[in-house]
A protein has these predicted regions:
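N-terminal pre-domains immediately preceding structured catalytic cores
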Residues: 2-138, 146-165, 169-189
Length: 189
């Protein structure tokens, strides 16, 4: 299926070969990335967000339905959201400062919360699902063309949604208040 990748990868790796007799430097993994948890896809944002939560709030983990939010927030800097599907956590930053962290619920078996880089495409303070029996989706923030969105909802702390990222209601409201259309969303796990 991906046979076209093999020649390209071989050509790329050929350029990485060491010169005979050359001294190779020892390389170490970046300090900001933890390999302790088996991520399927990560650029290091989710593991770093967890470290930032511990440093900022002194919390190692949150129970289902729990969240933390900073008492002060910088007025400058881009807002971004980091979602960790592996640990069922959502983090929000402004610039380099972690504003908040929350437990969440993503897609249950048979459904998908997609990995990757996204942006907020639509925001509505109250919305009803067109796919799932007119289900309420308060503080809805859609990130793709198929209906995947952040919203307030039932948060058991494990994957239980049809693909959306369900958040505790108060956290969903706070998140809605600090984002705008185009806010970056990174989903890892």
């Amino acid at each position: 299926m991906y046979k076209w990748l093999i020649p390209a990868a071989a050509a790329m790796l050929a350029g990485c070969a060491a010169t005979p007799g050359a001294q190779l430097a020892e390389t170490k993994p970046a300090a900001s990335v933890s390999n302790a948890v088996p991520y399927h896809w990560t650029l290091g944002n989710a593991p770093q967000a967890h470290k930032d939560m511990v440093a900022e709030f002194g919390k190692v983990g949150l129970k289902p339905g729990e969240y933390v939010w900073a008492s002060t927030a910088p007025s400058q800097g881009d807002t971004r959201i980091v979602v960790d599907l592996l640990t069922q956590m959502t983090y929000v930053y402004r610039g380099d400062k972690l504003l908040g962290a929350s437990s969440m619920s993503s897609a249950k078996t048979g459904h998908i919360t997609p990995y990757g880089n996204w942006t907020i495409l639509e925001k509505r303070p109250f919305y009803r699902s067109k796919k799932y029996d007119n289900a309420p989706m308060p503080f809805m923030q859609r990130i793709d063309d198929y209906g995947i969105a952040f919203h307030g909802g039932v948060n058991p702390g494990y994957p239980a949604s049809h693909g959306c990222i369900r958040l505790p209601m108060k956290f969903a409201e706070k998140l809605y208040g600090v984002t705008r259309l185009g806010t970056k969303v990174i989903i890892e796990g």
